[in-house]
Structure formats: structure tokens, C-alpha cells
């Protein structure tokens, strides 16, 4: 199977890794010069990966069923396990916010890009 992913942001990179893990040939098309660029600005440059105190009462959108299903399928523990499997060390603040131990969003982008490269995901930029 061949998979084309439009956009090399967090979702695009995660989707590419998931599809590649299932054996698909994957190509990411990103209009920026490199993937993950917007991730560098998240969490004031620290990249808040998740929150250990995440509950549905914190969700204020219109489709609560979708959010609940998504959170159950890929909860905080699974998110942290995923990033740990890529070699990212995280830290949890008293508020429950989870950040890379480096406190740099670039660390998250680097482990994702390295995983894409190691798994043979084709990336076309600009």
C-alpha cells in the first residue's frame, strides 16, 4: 500500500510513522522547508506533549464523543510510551503538563524526524 500525507506537522508525522509501521510506503508532502516547523513554537518553545490530569471535563468542543474516543485510544500513557520508544525523555510538572526533559520543542521534532528517516519515510519539502 502507498500512503501520501499532506502536511508534515505533528499529526502528519505521527500518521506517517503509524502507516509505515503497518508496512505502507509513505511520502509526506510539506510546503515548508522542513517538517515539524510549527511544533517549535508550541508550549512557548517547550512543546507540551500531554497532560497527566487530562479529563473530558477539560474539553469544550462540540464533538465530545470524538474527543473521548480519541483520548481512550491514545491516552497520556500511550502518548508517553510512544515518545519514550523514540528515545525522548520527558518530565511532568506539578500541573500535570508533560514536556521533553530538555525543555526544547526541537527535541521532539528531532526524534520524530529521526524516526521518519530511520523507517524510510520519504519527505518532500517546499
Can you say where each PLM-predicted feature lies in the sequence?
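N-terminal Rossmann-like FAD-binding beta1-loop-alpha1 element of flavoenzymes
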Residues: 1-28
Amino acid at each position: 500500500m502507498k500512503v501520501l500525507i499532506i502536511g508534515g506537522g505533528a499529526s502528519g508525522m505521527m500518521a506517517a510513522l503509524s502507516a509505515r509501521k503497518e508496512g505502507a510506503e509513505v511520502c509526506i508532502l510539506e510546503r515548508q522547508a522542513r517538517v515539524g516547523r510549527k511544533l517549535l513554537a508550541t508550549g512557548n518553545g517547550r512543546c507540551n506533549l500531554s497532560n497527566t490530569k487530562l479529563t473530558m471535563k477539560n474539553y469544550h468542543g462540540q464533538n465530545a464523543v470524538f474527543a473521548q474516543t480519541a483520548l481512550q485510544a491514545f491516552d497520556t500513557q500511550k502518548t508517553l510510551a510512544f515518545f519514550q520508544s523514540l528515545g525522548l525523555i520527558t518530565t511532568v510538572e506539578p500541573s500535570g503538563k508533560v514536556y521533553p526533559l530538555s525543555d526544547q520543542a526541537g527535541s521532539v521534532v528531532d526524534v520524530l524526524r529521526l524516526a521518519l528517516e530511520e523507517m524510510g519515510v520519504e519527505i518532500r519539502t517546499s
